[in-house]
Amino acid sequence: MSSIGTGYDLSASTFSPDGRVFQVEYAMKAVENSSTAIGIRCKDGVVFGVEKLVLSKLYEEGSNKRLFNVDRHVGMAVAGLLADARSLADIAREEASNFRSNFGYNIPLKHLADRVAMYVHAYTLYSAVRPFGCSFMLGSYSANDGAQLYMIDPSGVSYGYWGCAIGKARQAAKTEIEKLQMKEMTCRDVVKEVAKIIYIVHDEVKDKAFELELSWVGELTKGRHEIVPKDIREEAEKYAKESLKEEDESDDDNM
């Protein structure tokens, strides 16, 4: 509620006296309470990594994925309410399909990001609807445009990034991403770093078990968005665990 007055958070169409739209801020809180997702753009593609929390031992492995194929050349990573994210993934797929039907070639990622951002923004304007409780990243690679990465938040704002993080540990993840020389790295290099960052920011006290989801799109995949092969993912996880172990040992030595 507003510090100036109450009742300004009942509708997305109402501003508070200090110029805030509380329903949009609450939607962003839903994203901040979600597991972490990161996207990194490098010289030959884009890599996504998601910390998918396992809330029950009864879940089937691989269920409730947070990485989606939007089009052959576009991938999507989400944080926030999964049902809202699935709905937006369907909207993005429809936009990509309609563009190809009308113009005969793949939709440029900036155009797709702008179109979906407009749709998300429309849900912040009316009292009859609520804002989407998720943020998501879109990544693609083409010979003409190279690697591209965009993030859209619940307010409908879209930005292009070299590296981006969303979810509960986004600040810690961004700090780690900033240490990387992304413009000089390849997808194979970045996959290991993405896995390492997810393991670093994972809160073992509050959230015990999690599955690491990794996907990429780039020269290596011939411009197609694909899940990272199991052997490469396992290699990346091994690298992440060894790096964490080395850091813990060096911290113990310094004490």
UniProtKB/Swiss-Prot annotation:
One Gene Ontology term from the biological process aspect of the record: proteasome-mediated ubiquitin-dependent protein catabolic process
Domain of life: Eukaryota
Tissue: Detected in liver (at protein level).
Modification Phosphoserine occurs at: S243, S250
Keyword GTP-binding: no
GO CC aspect terms: cytosol; nucleoplasm; proteasome core complex; proteasome core complex, alpha-subunit complex
Location of N6-acetyllysine modifications: K57, K206, K230
Modified residues (N-acetylserine): S2
GO molecular function, one term: ubiquitin protein ligase binding
Keyword Nucleus: yes
Main location: cytoplasm
Protein keywords: Acetylation, Cytoplasm, Nucleus, Phosphoprotein, Proteasome
Subcellular localization(s) per the UniProt record: Cytoplasm; Nucleus
Listed SMART domains: Proteasome_A_N
Annotated InterPro entries: Ntn_hydrolases_N, Proteasome_alpha, Proteasome_alpha-type, Proteasome_asu_N, Proteasome_sua/b
PANTHER family per record: PROTEASOME SUBUNIT ALPHA/BETA (PTHR11599)
Function: Component of the 20S core proteasome complex involved in the proteolytic degradation of most intracellular proteins. This complex plays numerous essential roles within the cell by associating with different regulatory particles. Associated with two 19S regulatory particles, forms the 26S proteasome and thus participates in the ATP-dependent degradation of ubiquitinated proteins.
Family: Belongs to the peptidase T1A family.
Self-association state and partner proteins as the record states: The 26S proteasome consists of a 20S proteasome core and two 19S regulatory subunits. The 20S proteasome core is a barrel-shaped complex made of 28 subunits that are arranged in four stacked rings. The two outer rings are each formed by seven alpha subunits, and the two inner rings are formed by seven beta subunits. The proteolytic activity is exerted by three beta-subunits PSMB5, PSMB6 and PSMB7. Interacts with AURKB. Interacts with CDKN1A. Interacts with MDM2 and RB1. Interacts with the C-terminus of TBXA2R isoform 2. Interacts with DNAJB2.
Protein's recorded name: Proteasome subunit alpha type-3
Source species of the chain: Mus musculus (Mouse)
Lineage, uppermost ranks: Eukaryota, Metazoa, Chordata, Craniata, Vertebrata
Originating gene: Psma3
